Every structure is written in structure tokens, then in C-alpha cells.
Amino acid sequence: MTNLNYQQTHFVMSAPDIRHLPSDCGIEVAFAGRSNAGKSSALNTLTNQKSLARTSKTPGRTQLINLFEVVEGKRLVDLPGYGYAEVPEEMKRKWQRALGEYLEKRQSLQGLVVLMDIRHPLKDLDQQMIQWAVESNIQVLVLLTKADKLASGARKAQLNMVREAVLAFNGDVQVEAFSSLKKQGVDKLRQKLDSWFSELAPVEEIQDGE
């Protein structure tokens, strides 16, 4: 398994929907979450870059699909934040259509990272994202963000509760606690990304040997 250097990740482009994304090849891992789940902070912590993904004081600002390239053919995809109360209903529906379309149709999508505030996990839209991914045979990593906001005992209890709850999806769903502030869970995130980005390697090796 290749250990990628996520510090060299760079911004490629923004797209309003799946039709405006670059060609559907290589490997993509998508990041999704409610508008205040700490998605941008997690991407910045992962890549050790302060402003790779812009963090906004106004949740719901990320309305585009943002693509970042780790190395050629291996991309991180920052999906629009969902479920924020102050966003107009029509815009919410548009985002949800874009998210669903991306998860169902994007062939290069290898894994989905769903970020949830550890204090408020598994809201309706979080569950819908996981359900969509499982139905499309996409592996999921759930990051319970802002883990530093809870004491150790409460953190473990939330982690165990969510791990128990996701069993109902009958899919490949891993759950970890994460804190951008304390850098907790970053190694687990990198390990999962490395495994997803290595997924195509065995096939290529077989072809080379023929």
C-alpha cells in the first residue's frame, strides 16, 4: 500500500454539478457532511495546509463540488455541505440532487468520508449519504468531528453508539473519532485514504504480468 504525501495536495477546480467534473477516471475519495460538521477543517488538517479548503464562518457557503489532486489521477472531492437551516429550501434540494447524482454515477469514486459533529451524529441527511454509498457498493469512513469538545468517557460512548448504529446499513462503514484541533484521528484517516487510493494497483500488476 502506497503512503501518499497529502501535504502536496492542490486545488484543481470547482464544479456546480457532476456534468462539469473532469473525465471520470483515476480514483476519487469524496468528503461529505452537514454544513457545520468541520469538513474544511478536516481537509486542511489532513493536508497540513491552513487554507486548502476555505473554512467559512457562515455554514452552507460551499455550494460547489471542489476537486483537489493529491498526485496525478488521485483526487479528494469536497462535496457541498448539506442541511443548514438558513439555506433556502430550493437550494437544499439542488445540492441533494447533485450529491445523489455524484454518488450514484461517478465511476472513479472509491470511498466516501462522512463527517458528523460527535455531539449530533446520524442526522437524517447523514444517514441518507451512508445509505446511498452502501447501495452503490462504496466503502464509508464516518469521522465524528470536534471530538475534543467531549470528555474522554462521553467521546467513547458516542463512538460506540455510532459504531453500533451503522451496523444497520449492512455495508462497509468504519467509524472513528476526529479532532482537527487536537489532530486526533488524522492517522486513521490517512490510512483509509491510502488503502482506497491503492485499490486499483493489484489489477494493474496482473495486467503487467500477462
Curated annotation (Swiss-Prot):
GO molecular function, one term: metal ion binding
Highest taxon above the source species: Bacteria
Entries under InterPro entries matching the protein: G_ENGB_dom, GTP-bd, GTP-bd_ribosome_bio_YsxC, P-loop_NTPase
Keyword terms, alphabetized: Cell cycle, Cell division, GTP-binding, Magnesium, Metal-binding, Nucleotide-binding, Septation
UniProt entry tagged with the keyword Metal-binding: yes
BP GO terms, sorted: division septum assembly
Residues annotated for Mg(2+) binding in this entry: 40, 62
Cofactor: Mg(2+)
PROSITE patterns in the record: G_ENGB
Ranges where the EngB-type G domain occurs: 25-199
Pfam families: MMR_HSR1
SUPFAM superfamilies with a match to the protein in the record: P-loop containing nucleoside triphosphate hydrolases
Residues where GTP binds: 33-40, 60-64, 78-81, 145-148, 178-180
Gene Ontology annotations for the cellular component aspect, listed alphabetically: cytosol
Family: Belongs to the TRAFAC class TrmE-Era-EngA-EngB-Septin-like GTPase superfamily. EngB GTPase family.
PANTHER family for this protein: ENGB-TYPE G DOMAIN-CONTAINING PROTEIN, MSS1/TRME-RELATED GTP-BINDING PROTEIN
Job of this protein: Necessary for normal cell division and for the maintenance of normal septation.
Protein name: Probable GTP-binding protein EngB
Originating organism: Salmonella newport (strain SL254)
